[in-house]
C-alpha cells in the first residue's frame, strides 16, 4: 500500500508520468441483465434506464464524482491526484499544430454548454468535480425525468471485485460523494460486491453487450499505437 511504501522510503518517493492507460466510469445505456441488482421492481429498472438516457443526469453524475477521493483509497491522499486523467485519449498523446490534443479538445467543449467553459483537461488534477454544477444539472434532469413519470431515488448498480479491497473502498467513496452531493433521496449507489469471476463476466470480460450486468462501471483502456483512433 502507499502508506507502507511511504513509511519505508519516506523522502525518496518520486512520481513518474502517467502511461497510455486511461480509466473511466461508463454507463450501461441498454441494460438487459439483472442478476446482480438491488432493484426490486420493474419500475425501478425503468426509472434508472430512463435516467441514464438523460444527458443532464449523466452530466450530474460526472460533475458529482470526486475522483481525487476515489484515487486516494488506493494511492493515499498525497498521491491521489497523480493518477487522474480527464480524457480517454491522453491529453498529450498527439499534437495538433502547436497545441496538444487535450488543449484542442478543451477549446471545443464550450460548444456543448457554458458549464464546460474553462475546463482544464491536463493530467494529474480533477477537471470535473464541482458540487454546484452537479446539483444544477441534477435539478434540470429531475424536472425532465419527473415529466416522464420517473420515480426517485434513482438506483445505480455499480459492480466491484469483492477481493480487491482498494476497489471496494473506492466504490464506497463514490457512493458517499454522490449521495452527499446529490442527496440520497435523489440517487442511491448500490455497490454490488461480486466474486472475481462474476465481476469479470458482467463487466470487462462480458461475452456480449447483453451480459453487462450493471448501470455504472469503472473500466479502462490502453492504446496500441500512436494515433487517437486507437482509443
Regions found by a protein language model. Give the residues of each.
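Extracellular/periplasmic solute-recognition and catalytic clefts
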Residues: 1-38, 68, 72-74
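Extracellular/periplasmic catalytic domains that process cell-envelope and extracellular macromolecules
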Residues: 7-8, 18-20, 54, 149-152, ...
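Periplasmic binding protein-like
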Residues: 8-13, 180-231
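Structural recognition of the beta-strand scaffold that forms the well-ordered cores
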Residues: 14-16, 23-28, 60-64, 71-72, ...
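Solvent-exposed coil/turn segments that connect beta secondary-structure elements
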Residues: 19, 30-32, 66, 77, ...
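Flexible loop/turn segments at secondary-structure boundaries
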Residues: 23, 33-34, 70-71, 79-80, ...
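Short helix-loop capping/hinge motifs at secondary-structure junctions, enriched
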Residues: 31-57
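Append "and occasionally in soluble cytosolic enzymes with long acidic Gly/Pro-rich linkers
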Residues: 51-181
Amino acid at each position: 500500500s502507499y502508506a507502507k511504501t511511504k513509511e519505508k522510503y519516506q523522502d525518496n518517493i518520486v512520481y513518474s508520468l502517467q502511461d497510455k492507460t486511461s480509466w473511466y466510469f461508463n454507463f450501461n445505456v441498454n441494460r438487459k441483465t439483472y442478476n446482480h441488482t438491488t432493484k426490486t421492481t420493474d419500475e425501478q429498472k425503468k426509472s434508472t434506464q430512463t435516467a441514464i438516457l438523460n444527458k443532464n443526469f449523466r452530466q450530474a453524475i460526472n460533475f458529482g464524482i470526486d475522483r481525487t477521493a476515489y484515487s486516494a483509497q488506493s494511492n493515499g491522499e498525497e498521491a491521489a491526484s497523480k493518477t487522474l486523467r480527464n480524457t480517454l485519449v491522453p491529453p498529450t498523446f498527439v499534437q495538433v499544430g502547436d497545441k496538444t490534443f487535450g488543449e484542442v479538445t478543451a477549446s471545443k467543449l464550450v460548444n456543448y454548454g457554458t458549464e464546460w467553459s474553462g475546463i482544464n483537461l491536463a493530467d494529474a488534477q480533477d477537471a470535473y468535480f464541482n458540487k454546484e454544477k452537479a446539483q444544477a444539472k441534477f435539478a434540470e434532469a429531475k424536472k425532465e425525468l419527473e415529466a416522464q413519470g420517473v420515480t426517485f431515488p434513482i438506483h445505480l448498480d455499480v459492480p466491484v471485485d469483492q477481493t480487491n479491497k482498494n476497489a471496494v473502498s473506492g466504490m464506497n467513496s463514490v457512493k458517499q460523494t454522490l449521495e452527499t452531493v446529490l442527496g440520497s433521496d435523489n440517487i442511491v449507489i448500490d455497490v454490488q460486491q461480486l466474486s472475481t469471476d462474476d465481476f469479470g463476466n458482467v463487466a470487462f470480460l462480458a461475452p456480449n453487450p447483453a451480459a453487462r450486468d450493471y448501470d455504472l462501471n469503472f473500466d479502462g483502456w490502453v492504446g496500441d499505437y500512436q494515433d487517437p483512433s486507437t482509443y
